[in-house]
Amino acid sequence: DNLIPLALAAIVLFVLYMAYRKARQARRERLIDSYRFPESIAAKVGKTYPHLNDAEVMRVMQGLREYFHLCNMAGRRMVSMPSQAVDVAWHEFILFTRKYEHFCGKALGRFLHHTPAEAMRSPTSAQVGIKTAWRLSCLREGMQPRAAHRLPLLFAIDAQLNIADGFRYALDCKRSPGDDYCAGHIGCSSGC
């Protein structure tokens, strides 16, 4: 007799918790979309890559927003940074320590540390992180990660903007130059 009210209470609590999580996720997404980054971040990107015009610098800033969306979706899982240009913007944002800490707390619910690949716990951490970035990027752009028909923004931007020290990815690994990372392997290797 007492189990029915307890079961109903548990169901109600679960539904309320799920509604809270959904509302929190939507609030964080709106914050990431509307956040005004310090103007000097875009200036730093432009100084680092002087061949970029204003629209291309803004594309890098959009990439930074996109990266934060991926981190928000990933929760506490590590997401590797697929773009060198966007990484420059992220580094510059980190220098605004109070603003960065406040943004992370509100947009991600935690402080997002920047960990170089060399300092990761294990050699496979970066691989897991790039697979997470690939999967979430594809999902955000409406593609199945194992059957992407194009590169998502964060995987395409360095090549599109001709970033000399950038990361380059290719969907078709057989047709790509030898310097490209094979995105096909990221999307469909075992362990994805």
Predicted regions and their residues:
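Acidic, Ser/Thr/Pro-rich intrinsically disordered cytosolic tails and loops
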Residues: D1-C192
